[in-house]
């Protein structure tokens, strides 16, 4: 891991730019944040962006029209920084919600991918002393969360 101080909002904007150009014209992508622009926190930039890009890419794959929203928050989970990616796609069926982070888990066999992306996100989150979750209460599509504590040292 390559830990250094980074600006939260800049990391999110870079992740958005790397994915947004692939969005169909019927899908609006946007980023919002309640984090000050100058807010710094220590993380592994590449690993954090890998998780965000995976979440955004999955949202793009499964959203034919509507929107994809990346949000960064210091208030959703106090003492932690929360990144969320929400989309207006078909969502995750309740009977498959508990296995989305399992290796080789694919909810749609007709979509491109190996079923490893979310599992890798889970591993990265663990190494950063954080967690990834599916928001099972979200009803507008799918919403994935990447939650990092602000005071812990990631595993190497």
PLM region spans:
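Conserved micro-motifs of the catalytic ATP-binding
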Residues: 1, 40-43
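Short beta-strand/loop element within the Bergerat-fold HATPase_c
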Residues: 67-79
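Short helix-loop "hinge" at the ATP-lid/N-box region of the Bergerat-fold HATPase_c
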Residues: 59-60
